[in-house]
Amino acid sequence: MTLQARNLTLARGGAPILTDVSLTLAPGALVGLLGANGAGKSTLLAALAGELAPRSGQVFLGDADLATLSARQLARRRAVLPQKPSLSFDLGVSDVVGMGAYPFPELDPAAVRQLVRDALEQAGVTHLAQRRYPQLSGGEQQRVQFARVLAQCHAMHAPGQTRYLMLDEPISNLDPRHQMELLATARALAHEAGMGVLVIVHDINQAARWCDTLALLADGRLAALGPPADVLTPDHMRRVYGIEADVLAHPTLPGRLLVLAR
């Protein structure tokens, strides 16, 4: 079962944000969404998540139009990590991670506690479990929010049902080590757990290293879609980002690319 955007067009205040964009998120794949600032990446993710209604076009989860699904139904099938999660309450870290279980009231307290422990460990933030969320650094908060959506993903596990995870710039506040750890986890969720994972990143080389497929947006349109070798070309770098770049085989990662801006 795939999550599929078909010919999406979306505008705000009369200004086009997305124009005729089609994209498929399939189980077992990590898809990277690239583009310059203002290209429409976050808008496309929100439309795929069912949080924004397109002016035209549709998003399908299997055969179901997302517009026909309730917020609770969506939350039981896909988890979303927004670019800037808003949380103004003075909650403990474990309580924040436990919010991932909110769409699953059938879970008993013991099951929720286990979900929280597993998510904290998978996100590498077990040592923060007893801290208060507002006291954390920006990077620590980002990793705790990642643990929250991991808890949601684990809670939604059901035989024969594909799960989806959407991450909007999840590494923007992280140091290099934690960037790699988060993206490695995202790829493992796709390759090993069979989830469909979409991630927005600005670091082209991180996208080239971790993603199976790349979608390159430019001015609200899909400029390129395919494996990294087809998308990360000097011509695309010039047309989308306005930079001259050399695209080389990665010196230590077989089959991966390295993009060097001149």
UniProtKB/Swiss-Prot annotation:
Protein name, as recorded:
Hemin import ATP-binding protein HmuV
Domain of life of the native organism: Bacteria
Against NCBIfam families, the record matches this protein to: PRK13548.1
**Topology versus the membrane:** Peripheral membrane protein
Species per Swiss-Prot/TrEMBL record: Bordetella pertussis (strain Tohama I / ATCC BAA-589 / NCTC 13251)
- Describe its function: Part of the ABC transporter complex HmuTUV involved in hemin import. Responsible for energy coupling to the transport system.
One Gene Ontology term, aspect cellular component: plasma membrane
What family is reported? Answer: Belongs to the ABC transporter superfamily. Heme (hemin) importer (TC 3.A.1.14.5) family.
Location relative to the cell:
Cell inner membrane
| A family per Pfam | ABC_tran
Task: Give the E.C. number(s).
Answer: 7.6.2.-
Report a single Gene Ontology molecular function.
ATP binding
- Give the first-level EC class, as a single word: translocase
- Listed binding positions for ATP are 35-42
Q: Summarize the subunit comment.
A: The complex is composed of two ATP-binding proteins (HmuV), two transmembrane proteins (HmuU) and a solute-binding protein (HmuT).
Q: Which InterPro entries match?
A: AAA+_ATPase (IPR003593), ABC_transporter-like_ATP-bd (IPR003439), ABC_transporter-like_CS (IPR017871), P-loop_NTPase (IPR027417)
Which stretches make up the ABC transporter domain?
3-244
Which UniProt keywords are present, listed alphabetically?
ATP-binding, Cell inner membrane, Cell membrane, Membrane, Nucleotide-binding, Translocase, Transport
